[in-house]
C-alpha cells in the first residue's frame, strides 16, 4: 500500500467529522433553517420544534449572536406578519434561552424600537400588534437588566423576591411601580389581540387566529408571576406605609386585577389554549391589603404546561453525526484528492482510515444515545416538576379550605366536643403525613444519586411537607385555644359534624392522591436508575473505544498539525475581533461626545428661539400699537368733521346710516373676538389688527354719515344724533388708547363703543320715512295671483312627477328603476307637503287681513303694508320657481341627462323658499293663531321631505356609481410614497378649485341680490309672468315659473320710492 506524505493542509481541513469549522458551519446551517422556518410570512403560529432548536442554539453558543446575525437580515419592514412572528420568537428566546441572551438583545434595542415605530405609523392590523409587542419586549429587557435577580422567565422563590426588594421602603415602592408598568404592557398586548379577534366564531381553531393567539402563552406565564410578586410587595408596603399613601397603588392593582381576570377567563374558554396550557383561575375579588391576615388567604397562580406530544419527524442534531458522506462537497474533495495523488493500490480507502471512520461512527452513535438518555431524563424531571406544582396547588387549596373551617369554628366558640373529635382526626392525618414524609425521604435518598437537578425536586417536596406540618401545628394550637370555650350550643352540632365529615372525605381523597403520586414517583425513580445503569455501560464502552483510538494516535500527527494550524487561525481571528470591538468602543465614545455637542447646540438654539419669540411678541405689539394710533387718527378726523363748516352741505339717508351703524356693531363683535384671540396667542396679532382697521373705518364712516344725516333731520333729533356721534367718537378714542397701553390692553372694554353705536342705530331707525301707499289697486290682486300661480305650479309639478314615474317603470328596470322610483316618490311627497304649506299660508294671510284691516278694504290693507306684501309676493314666487326647477332636475336625472347634485340643490332652494314664505307670513300673524301653528308644522314637514329627497338622491347615486377598491398588494414602499405625494398634489389642486368656485358662488349671490333689489315693481313682474294654467297634454312639461326678482327687504337696502338716497360728499 502506498503511503502519502505531506498531504496538503487544504485537503486535510476539508475532511468531515473533526474540524471545528465544519461543526460551526453545520450549527449555523441548522440555526438558519430553524429561523427561516419559524419566522416567515405565513399566517400560522410558530412551530414549537423550530423555536426549541433556536433556544437550544442559544444554550449551545451561550448567547444569541447567531440568532441576531440572521435576524438582522430578515426583511421585517416588508411584512407585518413576519415582524409579528419575529417578536414571538424573540419573546420565547428571552424567556427560555441562555441568560446571556438578555445582554445580546440590549445591543439591538434600537432595531426593535425602529420596527415598532415603523409599523405603529401604518394602518395595518398586524402592524398595530407589532407596535405593542415591541414596547413589551423593550420593557422586558430594561426590567431584567435593571433587576438581574429576576431571570427572564420571572420564576424566583419568595426568598429571592424578599432579597431583591430589600428593606428600603423607597426601593420596594419603585420596584412595585416597575412591575405595574411591566404588567400594563402584557395586558395591553392581550387586549390588542382580543380586540382584533371575532369571538362570535371559533377563531382559535383557524390558522389566522392561532397566529395572533400563540404569543399569549408567554404573556400568561409572565402575568401569573407578576401578579404573585405585586401581591407580595403590596402587602409588604402596607406593613410599612399608611394606607392613604398607597391609595394610588391599590387603585392601579384593582384595575390590573380585573383586566387580568377577564384575560384568563377568555383564554380559558378558547379551545386553542386548553390543549397547550393550564390557565389558573383568579379569585372573585382582589386581596384586601388593609387586612394583614389576608396574605395567608392568597394562593399563588400556577401555570402548567402539559407534556408535549411526540412529533412525527426526528429533531435535527446541532452536530452532524451522519455516517454517510455529506452531499456534494465530500465527493468533490475525494475526486480532487484522487486527481492530485492518484488512487491507492487495490482499494479506494486505506484499512486504517476505514477503521478510524467506523470507530468515529460508533462514538457518534454512542454520543447521540447519551444525548437521548439525557433528554429523556430532563423530560421526566419536567414532568415530575409539573406534578409537584399541581400537588402544591391542591395543597394550597386544601389549606385555604381548612382556614375557612377554622374561621367558622372561631365564630362558633361553643363546639368543644366536636373540636376534640376534629383534633383526633388531625392527629390521624398527621400520622399519614409523617408516613408520607418517610417515603419522601426515601425517595430523596434515591434521587441523590442523580444530578443536581433532582435535588431541587426533593427540596420543593420537603418544603411542601414542612408547610403541611406547619398547617397541622397551627390546627393544634387553634384547637387548644378552643378548649377554653365553656358553653356549647346544641343547635349548631349538626352543621359542625357535617363540616367535619366533608373535611375528612377531602383529606382522605388528597391522601390517596398523594400516595398515588408517591408510587408514580418511585416508578420514575426506578426508570431513572435503569437509565443511569445504561449510561454507566455506555461510558465503559466509550472508555474502551478511547483506548483503541489511543493506539492509532501516532498516525494522526499530520491531522493534529492541521488542527493546530486551525487553532492559530482562530486565535488570529479572535485578535481581529478584539481589535474590531476596540474600534467599536472608540466609535461609541466619539458618538457620545458628538451627542454632548449636539445637546449644547440644542440648548443654544432654544435660548435663541426664546429671544426670537420675545422679539416677535414685541414686534406684534408694536404693529398693534401703530394700527391703534392710525385708527385713532382716523376717528379723530371723523369727529373733527362734525364741526367742519364745509361738511354742512353733505347729506345722507337714515337707511344708509342704519346700515353703517349695524356694520360698525358687527365690527365691535369682531374686535372682541380678535382681542380674545390675541390674549390667547400674543405672537399673532393679525386678527386683532384686521378687526381694529375695519372697526376704525366703519366707526368713522358712521360718525361722518351721522353728521350728514343730521343736516336733513329736524332740530331736536339732529342735536341728539350729533351728541351721540361725538360720544361714539370719544369712546372709540378711549378704546384706541387702551389698545396702545400694554397694561390696559388685557382689560380692554369694547362695550364702551357699543352703547353709542346702538344709540345712533336707534336714531337712524326713528328718522326713516314711512312707506308710501302705492298701487292700491294692484298689490292685493298681485298677492292673490301669486298664491294661485304657486298652487297651480305645484299641482302641475305633482302631475309631471307622476308621468315621469310611469315612464320610468316602462323605460328602466333593476337597480335604476328602484333608484328612480325612490327619488320620484320623495319628490312627490315634497310637492304634497309644499302644496299643504301654500294652502295653510293662504288661510293665514286671509286671517291676518281680516283681523288687521279694520274698516279699510283688503286692497288698502295690502297698500298700507307694502313692504310685507312685497316680501309675501317674493316668497310665493320663490316657492313656485323652486318647485318647477325641482321637476326639471328630476326629469333630467331619470333621463340620465342631469346630475344628482342639481336635484340636491333644488331641494335646498325649496327649503329656503318655504322658510321665507313662513317668515313673511309670521310677521303680522297672531302668535296664538291655530293657522300659524299648522303653518309651522307644515314648514317642518317640508324640511323633512326635502331632507328625504337629498338622502334618497345620495343613496341612489352611491348605489349606481361603481366604487373602485384600492389594492396596495403589489406596491412597494417607494411606489406607495410616490402615489401618496401625487394624491396630495391632486387634493391641493381640488381644494384650490373648490375655493375659487365658492368665491364665484358668493359673487353670483351678491349680483343676484343686487339685481333683485333693482328690479321693477310687482305689477311689472306680474305682467311679464307667463300663464300658469295647467296643460292637458301629459307629455309636455308644466309652465316654467320665473325666478323671483323681488328680494326680501333688508334694513340696509334702499328703494327709490322711499325718497331717500345715499350720502354724496360735495365740495364747493
UniProtKB/Swiss-Prot annotation:
Gene Ontology MF, one: protein heterodimerization activity
Effect of mutating residue 871 to D: Reduced acting binding
Disulfide bridge map: none
Residues modified to Phosphoserine: 1017
Domain I/LWEQ: 771-1012
Major place of residence: cytoplasm
Tissue expr: Brain, heart, kidney, pancreas, and liver, but not in lung or placenta.
SUPFAM superfamilies: ENTH/VHS domain, I/LWEQ domain
Region: Important for actin binding, residue numbers: 867-924
Pfam families given in the database record: ANTH, HIP1_clath_bdg, I_LWEQ
Domain ENTH: start-end pairs: 23-151
Residue(s) carrying N-acetylmethionine: 1
Compartment(s) of residence: Cytoplasm, Perinuclear region; Endomembrane system; Cytoplasmic vesicle, Clathrin-coated vesicle membrane
Biased composition (Low complexity): 590-600
One GO term describing the cellular component: clathrin-coated vesicle
Composition bias type Basic and acidic residues, residue spans: 425-443, 539-549, 1049-1059
Assembly information from the UniProt record: Homodimer. Interacts with actin; homodimerization promotes actin binding. Interacts with CLTB. Interacts with HIP1. Interacts (via ENTH and I/LWEQ domains) with BCL2L10.
Family designation: Belongs to the SLA2 family.
Domain notes from UniProt: Binds F-actin via the talin-like I/LWEQ domain.
Protein name, entry field: Huntingtin-interacting protein 1-related protein
Species for this entry: Homo sapiens (Human)
